Amino acid sequence: MTDILNKILATKAQEVAAQKAAVNAEHIRTLAAEAAPVRSFIDSIRGKHRLNLPAVIAEIKKASPSKGLIRPDFRPAEIARAYENAGAACLSVLTDEPYFQGSPEYLKQAREAVSLPVLRKDFIIDEYQVYQARAWGADAVLLIAAALEQEQLERFEAVAHELGMTVLLELHDETELEKCRNLTTPLWGVNNRNLRTFEVSLDQTLSLLPALEGKTVVTESGITGKADVEFMQSRGVHTFLIGETFMRADDIEAEVGKLF
């Protein structure tokens, strides 16, 4: 595990402890059960594929540790509508505040503005956060293999599935495959950003493709132009999680159109 990831996870542990003190586990479960019905994240992706279209998971992200502030003029509902108009399959919304300037309010605002399913993009380290995601209205959660042990991955996935949510499992390299072997989610993402160097290479996705046969593979990070999209499609990857490229655009809807 890298220094930056260790730092983020340590902060997250403190954050979750404070959240549990404010809203106990029993109450967050009740809120999750009372949340608006789930929109199927995986079905939305498969719907695009059935039409022979790429499935875009369009990200709403204000900032990141590596790039700092990405989009000063940040209006989640407006961004969500632009993504929906452009034909995105799903949304991804950052809810981590210390490192990504995210917020649960951004997730709620985005989801209320559109009919698309929404992923809570955060560092999940406790099953409490899975219930919390559903309580906030999320339809899917991200589980990062590098941040979790096998038992945690399996337990958090089970909770998410019990709540009707889709799990996007995120891998960085082949060393993480073994602890994920029992997971049943069909949606496996590969983050092209090296956690140690922060360098980005689409080879990360390509190197893992043989091991992910039969999965719906999502390529994450590093897609900056139409050539990248066409290259990944030529290799059999048809699902893309893209944030920064869209967030830096003056006209988000037009930028999505340029790539897809």
UniProtKB/Swiss-Prot annotation:
Superkingdom: Bacteria
Catalytic reactions on record? 1-(2-carboxyphenylamino)-1-deoxy-D-ribulose 5-phosphate + H(+) = (1S,2R)-1-C-(indol-3-yl)glycerol 3-phosphate + CO2 + H2O
Keyword presence, Nucleus? no
Which Gene Ontology BP terms does the record give?
Answer: L-tryptophan biosynthetic process
One annotated GO molecular function: phosphoribosylanthranilate isomerase activity
Q: What is its EC number?
A: 4.1.1.48
To which pathway does this protein belong?
Amino-acid biosynthesis; L-tryptophan biosynthesis; L-tryptophan from chorismate: step 4/5
Catalytic EC class: lyase
Q: Which PROSITE patterns match?
A: IGPS (PS00614)
Q: Which UniProt keywords apply?
A: Amino-acid biosynthesis, Aromatic amino acid biosynthesis, Decarboxylase, Lyase, Tryptophan biosynthesis
Q: Which HAMAP family match?
A: IGPS_B
Q: Which family does it belong to?
A: Belongs to the TrpC family.
Give the protein's recorded name. Answer: Indole-3-glycerol phosphate synthase
Give the species this sequence originates from. Neisseria meningitidis serogroup B (strain ATCC BAA-335 / MC58)
